[in-house]
């Protein structure tokens, strides 16, 4: 699977893929990444990629020409590319989106800067828009990395243990049950005894019960949908 990042600051993103699971996935050929900097295609004589908002408003917007030309270039090179814009006004990205997007061959993440992107770019090129929450970041790079990580870990072979994907939070519309490791007793706080008895059927039932309790406490919105 291939991921492209359209960003004015590729170094911010590049470092994230230089270690750990996603680096191994790249080395093993499970995923690949590349970068497109709109500044490379700007026709502005001063190499600018931003301008004041028409009609007034604080701050600057990314101008349409560099982004339009960059995205058109990507679509010419890769007609199947699925272009995703990151915006706080968009719908929240959820786990089901990650599982759906992993079926795409090529995803392009467009990272905004300044006060955002000229709306005409979004209207022409966006296949989807996503938000990672009701808050504002200084740029879209972090959000792009979040989405890429969430999608990439669903690519077959990226995680060493595929079972991990089946028992994670949100996979059954519930939060994941509490997990424990050694020591069994730590500072007079013991692991639930049922986990130690080896009865896998009872452990499964216990985990589901704990997952329901955890979801009800931390995410009552999910709990209401489940029950």
From Swiss-Prot:
Q: Which SUPFAM superfamilies match?
A: alpha/beta knot (SSF75217)
Binding of S-adenosyl-L-methionine occurs at 112, 132-137
Q: What EC number(s) are associated with this protein in UniProt?
A: 2.1.1.228
Q: Which residues form a coiled coil?
A: none
Catalytic activity of the protein? guanosine(37) in tRNA + S-adenosyl-L-methionine = N(1)-methylguanosine(37) in tRNA + S-adenosyl-L-homocysteine + H(+)
Q: Which UniProt keywords apply?
A: Cytoplasm, Methyltransferase, S-adenosyl-L-methionine, Transferase, tRNA processing
Q: Which Pfam families match?
A: tRNA_m1G_MT
* Broad enzyme group: transferase
Key word Transport present: no
Question: Which Gene3D superfamilies does the record match to this protein?
Answer: 3.40.1280.10, tRNA(m1g37)methyltransferase, domain 2
Localisation per UniProt entry? Cytoplasm
GO cellular component terms given for this protein:
cytosol
Write down the superkingdom of origin.
Answer: Bacteria
Q: Please tell me where this protein is predominantly located.
A: cytoplasm
Q: Which GO terms describe its biological process?
A: tRNA N1-guanine methylation
**Molecular function GO terms recorded:** tRNA (guanine(37)-N1)-methyltransferase activity
Oligomeric state and interaction partners are given as: Homodimer.
Q: Which family, according to the similarity comment? A: Belongs to the RNA methyltransferase TrmD family.
Instruction: Name the job this protein performs.
Output: Specifically methylates guanosine-37 in various tRNAs.
Q: Per its UniProt record, what HAMAP family does this chain match?
A: TrmD
**Name the UniProt record assigns to this protein:** tRNA (guanine-N(1)-)-methyltransferase
Which gene is the coding source of this polypeptide chain? trmD
């Amino acid at each position: 699977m291939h991921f492209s990042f359209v960003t004015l600051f590729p170094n911010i993103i590049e470092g994230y893929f230089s270690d750990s699971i996603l680096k191994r996935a790249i080395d093993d050929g499970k995923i690949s990444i590349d970068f497109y900097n709109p500044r490379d295609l700007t026709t502005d004589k001063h190499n600018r990629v931003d301008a004041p908002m028409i009609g007034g408003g604080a701050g600057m917007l990314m101008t349409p020409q560099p982004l339009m030309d960059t995205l058109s270039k990507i679509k010419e090179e890769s007609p199947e590319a699925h272009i995703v814009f990151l915006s706080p006004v968009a719908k929240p990205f959820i786990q089901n989106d990650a599982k759906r997007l992993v079926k795409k061959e090529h995803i392009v993440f467009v990272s905004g800067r300044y006060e955002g992107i000229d709306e005409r770019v979004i209207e022409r090129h966006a296949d989807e828009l996503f938000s990672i929450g009701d808050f504002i970041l200084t740029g879209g790079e972090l959000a792009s990395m979040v989405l890429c990580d969430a999608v990439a870990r669903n690519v077959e072979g990226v995680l060493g243990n595929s079972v991990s994907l089946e028992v994670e939070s949100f996979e059954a519309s519930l939060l994941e049950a509490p997990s424990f490791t050694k020591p069994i007793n730590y500072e007079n706080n013991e692991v639930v005894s049922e986990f130690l008895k080896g009865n896998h059927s009872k452990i499964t039932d216990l985990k589901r019960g704990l997952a329901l309790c955890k979801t009800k406490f931390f995410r009552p919105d999910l709990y209401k949908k489940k029950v």
